[in-house]
Amino acid sequence: MTNVLFAVGWAAVGAAAGWLSRWGSVKLARLEELEPGFKPWQVYGPSVLAALLFGLFAYDLGTAHLLLLVLRSVFVLVFVQVIFFDLEHRLILDRVIFPAMALAAVASLWNQPWWAGIATGLAAGLIFLFLSVAGSAMLKAEVLGFGDVKLAAFMGLVLGWPWIVTALFYGVVLGAVAAVGVGIWKRSMHATFAYGPYLALGAIAVLYAFH
């Protein structure tokens, strides 16, 4: 019962954090000269998803691992911001991802040598850079943006080895299925598509289930 009550309370914190994420995203969009949307999923989605995820992580970790819960909640909030901003604007912001990468690099020192997290993040980023360049060369169109490359590097810093492999696999599979669905729906396999949300979902799944 204690864990349930704590999870409910932390879910409320997540709802508030999600609202702040949306508020900040609107401000950042305007700095990028982008017009934010105000559809229900855009306005309420971050709060709902953050509340759900914060509650799940709180129930799993409990009060015995409070510092770890706070840290993971911050990373989850970054992924939530990426999901909704990239879906809305097809953009992953340097103003969000670079500070998050710095925090993840420091946090990676917690349970591994200083170079391990950096090496994993760099490797993940380079893999996606290669996929981006190769895909663009073969298809004559941008397949993965540099935002996806930076997101992959952030995931590597957060998850470390070997969990980054699982997260990228989940993200790529989810993204491929969604891309085919969007292509069929729009009757064009060259439709604009955001891969970042699916990479972020893969990272969240691994962070919760295996890490």
Model-derived segments and spans:
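A membrane-topology feature that recognizes alpha-helical transmembrane segments
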Residues: 1-211
